[in-house]
C-alpha cells in the first residue's frame, strides 16, 4: 500500500474525524500486514489566541510571550484525529490508550509563531499485553525544527507479543521512591467538557460518567495532557530544568486515570537541570502520571 498524505492549510475539522472513528468498521491489527504509513502536514499553523487563553485559564497556567511546552501537541490534536480515523487505519480509536510521550523543545516558541506541523504514524512494537504504536510530530519555523514529539499508543490484544515480543522497547519511568510531597490541587467536575471544547478531544470517557463506566472506569476522567500541564506548572519543572531558554525534554508515562472532581497531589525529586515528578489521584497509592523535565 502506498503512503497516505494529508495536507492542510488551516486547522483540520474534528467533527468528521470523530464520526469516522465512531462509525467506520475496523479490520483490526494484523502482524502480517502491519500499519499503513499515514502522514499529515499543516502548513502555516498558528495558535488561536482565544483557544490559547482559554487553555491557560482552564489549567491555571501563567501567561507568557511563549507557547506552553505542551501546546504544539494540542494544536496538532485535530490532525492526529484525522490520521487515526482514516479508513485504512485498522485499529479502533476508542479502544486505544495514549500511553507515553517524549517531547523535545529546542527553543522557545513565540505565541504568534507561524509553524509547519508534520505528523506521521511511525513504528510499532509487539508487547506482552498487546501492541504499541508511535506517532511522531515535528514543528518547524522557516524550515528549522523547534519542537518534536513521539506519542506512544497502546492497543490491548493477542498479537504474539507474549511469546515473541519486539526487541525494541519504548522508554519507561518507574515510580519515585520516597519523594517529597510538594503540591496539590483540585480537578473540577467540568474539566472534561471545558478541555474538550478547547482542544477538540471529545473522547466519551472525558465527557460522560456513563460512557467512562462502559470502558471500565468508575466515572469520567480528566484529559491526561491537561493534568500533565498543571503538574509541570505546579512543580516548577521547567524553571528547575533551566528555563525555556534551554532545550528541554519532557517524558511522561500515563499509568492510570485522574478522575474528575478529585483531589490530586504531586511528589517530586529535583536535581540539577532535571525535575522528576509523579501525580497521584485521591487515595490511590500508585501514581497516575509519571513525568520528567530535563535540559538536553
Language-model features and meaning:
Residues 1-100, 160-166, 171-242:
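Hot-dog-fold acyl-thioester-processing enzymes
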Residues 1-24, 30-35, 79-81, 96-184, ...:
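HotDog/MaoC-like acyl-thioester-processing domains
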Residues 39, 148, 247-249:
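Hydrophobic residues on conserved beta-strands that form the core of alpha/beta folds
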Residues 235-269:
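A conserved acidic, glycine/proline-rich C-terminal tail/linker
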Amino acid at each position: 500500500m502506498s503512503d497516505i498524505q494529508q495536507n492542510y492549510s488551516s486547522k483540520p475539522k474534528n467533527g468528521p474525524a470523530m464520526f469516522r472513528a465512531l462509525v467506520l468498521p475496523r479490520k483490526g491489527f494484523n502482524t502480517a500486514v502491519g500499519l499503513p504509513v499515514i502522514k499529515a502536514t499543516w502548513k502555516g499553523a498558528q495558535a488561536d489566541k482565544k483557544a490559547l487563553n482559554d487553555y491557560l485559564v482552564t489549567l491555571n497556567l501563567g501567561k507568557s510571550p511563549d507557547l506552553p511546552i505542551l501546546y504544539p501537541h494540542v494544536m496538532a490534536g485535530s490532525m492526529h484525529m484525522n490520521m487515526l480515523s482514516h479508513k485504512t487505519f485498522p485499529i479502533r480509536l476508542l479502544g486505544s490508550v495514549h500511553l507515553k510521550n517524549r517531547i523535545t523543545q529546542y527553543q522557545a516558541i513565540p505565541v504568534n509563531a507561524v509553524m509547519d506541523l508534520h505528523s506521521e504514524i511511525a513504528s510499532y512494537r509487539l508487547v506482552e499485553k498487546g501492541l504499541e504504536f508511535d506517532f511522531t510530530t515535528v514543528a518547524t519555523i522557516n524550515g528549522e525544527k523547534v519542537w518534536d514529539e513521539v506519542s506512544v499508543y497502546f492497543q490491548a490484544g493477542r498479537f504474539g507479543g507474549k511469546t515473541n515480543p519486539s526487541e525494541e522497547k519504548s522508554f519507561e519511568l518507574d515510580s519515585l521512591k520516597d519523594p517529597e510531597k510538594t503540591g496539590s490541587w483540585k480537578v473540577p467536575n467540568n474539566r472534561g467538557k471545558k478541555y474538550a471544547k478547547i482542544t477538540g478531544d471529545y473522547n466519551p470517557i472525558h465527557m460522560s460518567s456513563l460512557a467512562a463506566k462502559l470502558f471500565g472506569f468508575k466515572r469520567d476522567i480528566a484529559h491526561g495532557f491537561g493534568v500533565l500541564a498543571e503538574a509541570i506548572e505546579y512543580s516548577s519543572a521547567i524553571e528547575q530544568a533551566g528555563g525555556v531558554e534551554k532545550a528541554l525534554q519532557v517524558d511522561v508515562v500515563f499509568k492510570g486515570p485522574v478522575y474528575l472532581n478529585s483531589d490530586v497531589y504531586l511528589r517530586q525529586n529535583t536535581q540539577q537541570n532535571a525535575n522528576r515528578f509523579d501525580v497521584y489521584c485521591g487515595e490511590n497509592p500508585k501514581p497516575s502520571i509519571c513525568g520528567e523535565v530535563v535540559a538536553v
